[in-house]
Amino acid sequence: MSSLAPAAPPAGTPLWRRKIALPPGLARADAAALGALALIVIVLCWPVLAQGRVYWERDLHLYLYPHAEALVRVVAQGSLPLWNPYVAFGEPLLANPQMQLLYPPTWLQLLMTPWTWYAGVVVAHLFFTAVGAYVLARRWQTSRPGAFLAAAVWVTSGPLLSFVNLYHHFCGAAWIPWVVATSDRALARRRARDVLACGVALALQIVTGSADMCALAGVLAAAGALRHVEWGRARWWHNRHLVLTGALALLLGLGLSAAQWIPTTAMASRSSRFDQPERIRTYWSVHPATLVQAVVPVPLGALPLSDEARSALFESREPFLLSLYLGLAAGVLVLAAIVETRAARAVALVLAVVVLLALGRHTPAFAVVTTLIPPLRILRYPVKVMVAAALLWAMLAGMGADALGRTDRRRRRLTVLALAVVAIGLAASLGIASATRPDELGAAFLQRRALDPPFSVALVPVARRVLLAVGFATAVGAAALLALAPGRRWTATVASLFAIVDLLVANEGLNRTCPPELMAWRPPAVDIARAPDGGRTYAYDYYVATRGRASLSHAAYALATPPADPSVGAVALRGALYPSVLAQWGVESSYDLDQQGLFPKELAVLSRGLRIVEGTPVHLKLLRMGAVARVAAMHTAGFDDLAPVATLPTLFQEPLRIYAVPDPVPRVHVVGGVVVAEGDAALAALQDASFDPARAVLLPAGAAVATPPRAPGRCQIVSWKPDRIVVEADMDSPGYLVFADTYDPGWRTRVDGRPARLWRADFALRAVEVPAGRHVVESTYRPLSVGLGLAVSAVSAILGAAAWLRRGV
């Protein structure tokens, strides 16, 4: 019997002359396109791949890397990865979607440093999402060259690359083309394996932790589903199958990912995330004036904008997305697609709706959609929607490249060229004005202080970038004109190359890197600020308006000298012990601000309240109540009742001062008095001078008990792990064991092996009642939501596997 395996090459055949066996179903043209996409990713990530540098900006060094180190510490202590003790009196670990605990790549953090790990994640996800865009374009009937261009425009687009420093959004965005492509295939073929593939893709996107990206994928998938609808009453049976197929894929995706979203939903239900005010949800909306950045490479956020301009355009902050640039040269191809094909016009209509949503508070659209679909109220920052616009723009560019191959539509092509000339002319005018009249242009929206350089220093580089983009777009327009002649199909290839190079040049260096040693550096202040005897540390946050920030004679976090490299600012923040980075070195923090909107409401109120009472005796009381033994700050005002420990130099204009808090309560202590109050009355009780957290506990219900003259007993910690605490209590009379840790109903407490009620104590912490005598109190974190989620995911996986095997896939 002859073998089906390919014959081995003759001995001695050089490697480069041997035929490479491609995977089944993969044509050589596809392999060439994927190879070219890999080359583009290499160019984008060259500093990381060739120089060993790492990404560091924004959420990466402030949240991702500390959280990754916290996860490693929790696992190393033999605990289940359910509770993170290092953030704000402790918080759920698995339930926090930004931890991405169920996303498979996350567990590689156990094998390497988080910054090295994330560099690999970026490279892998950029290539992965480029392949997904290629597959999606092919699903949408684009040719292989057109699909390659679509994938290249997507992976080099400003919005997608801007998400690199917003890690969970980046991972979620990488899955958007795959979710849309697999849903399109499932709806078209209605086969079990295609439904399973769509469900798995959706589940993996959900566990990346970005609800925003999941919502965007759902919107695009729903829009794509419309092309499979057969309109008319006689086609209702076919459309019924479409609905059934989509529902099965959605249910499978939700079932497989239930271990993530059920605990996350339980966590969010106790927070203020569902009650965000309109001003928070629509913060960082795309200003209509900044939409010009989508087709003209003007980095407005990096310019020295006047206070008025920055307030209007970026909420007086840095832009949420560093680049909105989608490509001026690609725009010529987008115009060609819209003018020449009906399918492209349908995609363009969805693109227009998406951009309208990105405008957020500047139009009623975002408010209308979130009102009609209440679950979407959990989403915030409409500018994120621009990543969906980038994908649609890329698909249109691919369609436009295909349109250039048609030579029978001269009138339409001339219409495209006329529109392109207008757009290119406007961009060229902006570039020329920036180069020749920087003072007049800069005076309109830039600021210049006495020692600042002239406006030309900021605007001339912008002019160069804009005029270079104009040159690329002009070349694409010329290629479109030449394509009208028969036999010039090569013009589409030339146009595609110019469109890709335009985006590569414009977004080059968008995500800055630094040597890995900067992220590994351990500031000397860490060991001094670490609280003794299991106490907590309170690190001051100067990004929020407080009395402490107002006491500084300069802007918050102002560097002492101009930085030689942007990464110096990150090093300075870490050296000054910015609150969120404490977890990287295993320092347990306290009173952190609720940046994600996922803290329990009571804890968020308590943390804000600490800032409100600065400079009063209540401030010290709250520090003592939270077992805070050390305070790290760069100011002195309001800390007269604290004891100075050390003063350390920083890269900022102020040194870092470490203070000791007098007489903080132990992490676990016994009290006899009970004060009963809830809500505003509880906050008032905390501030009452008669309430001493070392002798009494504040409970939301029950019977009040007068504070005894001395503690009703003693306690000793026997075992302390992140998810399990064992305490021995020797009680002379009944009392309460108070834990200076966040209350969460997932903590299961037993006294001598018998279940005991866990109380929310001191407004946001927790306590358990203990009778007289010697007792062992065991508190273990095992939330019901995690068990339920794991059970649903397990059942879904079993059902999915059974369907897969039954179909003989």
Which residue ranges define each predicted feature?
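Hydrophobic alpha-helical membrane-insertion signals
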Residues: L15-P92, T265-S272, V332, L518, ...
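Contiguous transmembrane helix-bundle modules in multi-pass membrane proteins
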Residues: L166-A174, T182, A186-G199, A203, ...
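Membrane-embedded helix bundles of polyisoprenyl
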Residues: L37, A130-W140, R144-V229, T245-T264
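Extracytoplasmic
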Residues: Q276, T282, R448, L497, ...
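Active-site-proximal, structured, solvent-exposed surfaces of multi-pass membrane proteins
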Residues: L64, V332, L356, G626, ...
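Start-transfer (signal-anchor) and selected internal transmembrane alpha helices
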Residues: M1-W46, L242-L250, L335, L481-L497, ...
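Membrane-interface coil-to-helix junctions
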Residues: A38-V131, A152-A174, I280-L326, G360-I373, ...
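Periplasmic/ER-lumenal interhelical loops and adjacent helix-loop junctions
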Residues: L64-V75, S79-P81, G253-A337, I378, ...
